[in-house]
Amino acid sequence: MNHVVILSLYRLFLSPLAWIIIALSQLITAYFFLGHLDHYLSVQDQLSTLSHPPGVGQLIIAPFYKDTALILLLLIPVISQYLLTEEKYTGSLLFLLSAPLTSAEIILGKYLASLIFCCCLLACLSIMPLSLSHGTKIDYFTLLTGLLGLVLLCTTATAIALYCSSLTQHPAIATIISLTVLLLLWHINWNQQSSLLSWLSMHDHTTRLLQGHLHTQDIAYYAIHSILFMLLTIRRLAL
C-alpha cells in the first residue's frame, strides 16, 4: 500500500494539475480572506460600542474556512478522478491490479495520497488566518477546530469522489458525478425543515466545526460516510 501512496503522490506532484490546483486555491482564498479582513476593519467603530463584540474568529476565520470548504468540494473531485479514473482511462490501473496487491490496498493507497495532498493544501491555506496573530489575539481553539472540520470534510469528500470515479472510465463524467453528489449533500437541507436531511447535510456538520463547536455527532457523520464509501469503492474495484 505504501508503494501505491508514494507512486500516486509522485504522479500527482509531477503533473501540472497539482500545481495549478495549489495556485488557484491560494489565489481564490486570498481574495476571500482579504474581503473578510476588509469587512472586519470597516466595522471596527460599530464593534467598539458592543459589550461583547465578536472577534476575528467569528468575523474572519470562520467565514474564511467556510469559503475554503466550498472550494475544496470543487477541487477534490478533480484530484480523485486524476488518481483513479485517469488511470483507468489510460490503462495504467491494470498494472496495479496485476501486482500482488488487494483491491483494498490499492484504494486505500489512492485515498491516503489524496488526503496527503489535501493536507498539504490546507497547510498552505492556514498561513493566512495564522498571520492574524501578528496583529491581534486569535482564538486558537476555533482555528484548530475549524481546521479539523476541513480535514474531516476532505476525508468524506475524497471517499465519495473516489467511489464516483470508480463508476466510469471517463474523467469528465467522474468529475461531474462527484461534484453533483457533493454539492447535493452540501445543500440538501436548504429549507432547514427535516431532521433527517439535517443529519445528511454536510453543510450543517461542517459549519458547526468551522464555528468552533466540537460535537461527537459531527465527527461520527464523517467517519460513517468515509468508511461506507471506501467499502463501496473497494467492492466496486473488486468486481
Where are these regions (language model features)?
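Helix-loop-helix units of permease transmembrane domains in multi-pass membrane transporters
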Residues: L83-A113
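Terminal transmembrane helical anchor/hairpin motif
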Residues: G35-L59, L167, I177-L239
